[in-house]
Amino acid sequence: MSAEPSRNPRTPPVSAVDIDGAAKRIAPVVTPTPLQLSDRLSAITGAAVYLKREDLQTVRSYKLRGAYNLLVQLTDEEIAAGVVCSSAGNHAQGVAYACRSLGVHGRVYVPAKTPKQKWDRIRYHGGAFIELIVGRSTYDLAAAAAVDDIERTGATLVPPYDDVRVIAGQGTIAVELLEQLNTEPDLVVVPVGGGGCIAGMTTYLAERTANTAVLGVEPAGAAAMMAALAAGEPVTLDYVDQFVDGAAVNRVGTLPYAALTAAGDMVSITTVDEGAVCTAMLDLYQNEGIIAEPAGALSVAGLLETDIEPGSTVVCLISGGNNDVLRYGEVLERSLIHLGLKHYFLVDFPQKPGALRRFLDEVLGPNDDITLFEYVKRNNRETGEALVGIQLGSAVDLDVLLARMQGTEMHVETLQPGSPAYRYLLL
């Protein structure tokens, strides 16, 4: 699924000149990140595929670029009043690092459910210049507390994406990749959350290249930019899947939306499901040794679901690498489901000896494994329900497995990914 903005160009909120200026401002602090050719992705697509490694940025994401570009332009009065942001992730770390670098005091509001290791990283980057304020239960409440703060204290709010200084800062990634590539790419693939990064990069590429196209990639469960383009304005999503947390926003920024509509048909938006993102994460780790967070792997996941012109030059932005190692169990699970290797069933077992053994002998194939078995014995009933997870040796074995199940006396219900029962019992 993809969508394109209006083909009636408008004036973007920032310009290439603004972005060039931002590149000069942030140069003392921001690390130029590598642009690396991926032999694997090049072989798969038939194109020359490069990875722009913002996961190797100082705070392990591109967010420092926009935060620093905003803070470095504050007036003396604004510096004295300090800055405020609300974030549970990369934006907070970028703001914290920029505050310490410039000697600006800041307050970061984070939801109470934020993992402690993220608190620790924010404190590490900000040092004595950052006050971490924890307490509100959700991000929306933390954001509301930040707004209350600036109204009460006169501090400057540092938005994660809906600010021209932030957009210009994120756009410096495009400045860098053009210098490193030394030619015009045919396609640049960018993850999309609130839209600040794709807005800045698209604006710069629109002015500084002749024929470069931009593909924005959103998680299917948080497709806020696609919804905005379809509606003709930013809209608020009723539900957002939080798994790809770095891109899980319910409404894109007004300024990023304006930048994309101004770019016309050079930019398009596509979505990928969260399982494809997990598969891309694991492939990047196992093949390139890249530890990408879910949002950081969006571009590669989108690339692999897009028809690419053989012989073309493509750049994929790996936007961040702040991943929690404790999430890898869920990452692997979602990837196996996406690849058709993991399936779940509700099975009514006869409550008599040998029922499980018969299931193993009659239903399971030689390369299939039971990965989950939760059984509840019922008194005064002839059958008992079990939740059964099966991992196949190959995705093509599913039809054979289902046929064997139908040939038994047991009633079997396949749980479909995305259904309410599936989400309740499993993910």
UniProtKB/Swiss-Prot annotation:
Reactions that this protein is recorded to catalyse: L-threonine = 2-oxobutanoate + NH4(+)
List of residues that carry N6-(pyridoxal phosphate)lysine: K63
Requisite cofactors: pyridoxal 5'-phosphate
Class of this enzyme: lyase
GO molecular function, one term: pyridoxal phosphate binding
Residues the entry annotates as binding pyridoxal 5'-phosphate: N90, G193, G194, G195, G196, C197, S319
Keyword annotations of the record: Amino-acid biosynthesis, Branched-chain amino acid biosynthesis, Isoleucine biosynthesis, Lyase, Pyridoxal phosphate
InterPro entries from the UniProt entry: IlvA (IPR011820), Ser/Thr_Dehydratase (IPR050147), Ser/Thr_deHydtase_PyrdxlP-BS (IPR000634), TD_ACT-like (IPR001721), TD_ACT-like_sf (IPR038110), TrpB-like_PALP (IPR001926), TrpB-like_PALP_sf (IPR036052)
Record-annotated ACT-like domain positions: 343-417
Pathway: Amino-acid biosynthesis; L-isoleucine biosynthesis; 2-oxobutanoate from L-threonine: step 1/1
GO biological process: isoleucine biosynthetic process; L-serine catabolic process; threonine catabolic process; threonine metabolic process
Superkingdom per UniProt: Bacteria
Family per record: Belongs to the serine/threonine dehydratase family.
NCBIfam families on file: PRK08639.1, THD1
Subunit: Homotetramer.
Task performed by this protein: Catalyzes the anaerobic formation of alpha-ketobutyrate and ammonia from threonine in a two-step reaction. The first step involved a dehydration of threonine and a production of enamine intermediates (aminocrotonate), which tautomerizes to its imine form (iminobutyrate). Both intermediates are unstable and short-lived. The second step is the nonenzymatic hydrolysis of the enamine/imine intermediates to form 2-ketobutyrate and free ammonia. In the low water environment of the cell, the second step is accelerated by RidA.
Name of the protein: L-threonine dehydratase biosynthetic IlvA
